[in-house]
Amino acid sequence: MKKILFLVAAVVSMVFTACIKEEFNVNENAPVGSIEFTASFDAETKTTLNMNNGKTEWVKGDLISINGVMFEAIASGASVKFRNAETPQGEFKAPFTAVYPYTSELPNTSELPTTQTVKNGTFADKSVVSVAYIEGNDENNLTFKHVSSVIKFQVATEGVTELVFSSSKDLAGKIIVDKYASYSVSDGSKTITVKPENGTFSTSEIYYVSVLPTLGTDNQDFAIQTEGVTVKSGNVKFVRNTIADAKSIEVKYTYMRPSLVWNIANPRYAAYFFLDDNIYRWVDMDDDDNDGVYRAVVPEGLPKVIFCRMNPSNSTNDWDKKNMWNQTVDLNVNKGQAYIVKPLTWDKGAGTWYSLDLAKTYRENVVYLKPNSNWKQSNAWFAAYLCNGSKGTKWLKMESVDGTFYGVELPSDFDATNYKNIIFVRMDSGKTALDWGSKWNQSGDLACTKMTNSPYNRCCAINNGQWDCGSNVTWTTTLK
């Protein structure tokens, strides 16, 4: 296992020097029949990458392939011995080709991993493909050269757990290398999954990812994604043994809190990000922490958004009404803020942007009624009556939400002191006056603390079979 250790936050693209003789040195303390190489690092490692006081070291147990034979580092350090970990079959003599990291494939085959777990100031284990070649002479030096290129980056956003690097050309996979540190792909991958060692990227650390250099003269399209969304992209050329600095990667999020009405029927939610009619991207939204606020990663270069209520039985995101049930108006993305869908509206209601913290504690100032089948007879309409508080009494006419639920916005001064009780009233379909003269049936005096105290019930259901129901009702926090 090779570690790249730094005294300061700097990157290194390695050139290794190993030592070899055509007639091998034999350590008197080594097992009979063993072959040893001494590996160290030359000055090019530092000058090529402007490394400041850093060093590259082997770690005990590192494995390399020399002419297809496995050799293992018997100690850690900048200059260590490698000893054959298996007995060579047939002749084992120069010329020699050495490859890191070791694979059991053909002698000149190696693999740049498609998943790399990175840590501050260093590469992922076994991610830096290197090669050395010697014709055979009295000198005992093998110079390892990088086949890989390196991407340096930081993550500016807290909480990011995974990035995916993708390209129009291969970035990783199984490769066949030659003595000049060139390569051909035998089983390539156009993506590399990058994960932090500690589970979450730190915003204060620098990370490095090893990638294959760009083949050919043309640049390649390159993108950095998280949660399937591109957050940074460009047209680049990766060069062997050099660094491409991706600088700071910012993952932008936007948020939406649906109304209780929108949450009827357990929909899913999606965000439609766009620049114009031709440049757009659908992104699924999630509420992983169950706080009622849904999140989406903002794609690079798309400054506008429409939040959509979607059919949960269909995963397709488009404007077909079988899939998209309801939508907001066109909005400018407010990074880090949450859009609150206006209560009692289905489409294009004038919602409000809130800070994320406020959105998480937001409660609609609305009360809902779910009448039973008795109450819905004879085309009755419904009202709420606030009373027994310091603000006197107030009648509120309730409007149908979807034929099952009825709702009305409460006064701005509503609390359990100003209005201690609420009475739900079934009203005569032949009358329009908002008073007791239009009453057919009613609930009892219900405590408003049901709505003002946690768990903040907002919907009152008249229990089945009831007419004048007293307190025979069921309160719920959602419309169900």
PLM-predicted stretches and their roles:
Residues 28-30, 37-39, 53, 171, ...:
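Insoluble glucan recognition modules
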Residues 2-8, 12, 16-278, 359-388, ...:
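Sec-type signal peptide cleavage vicinity
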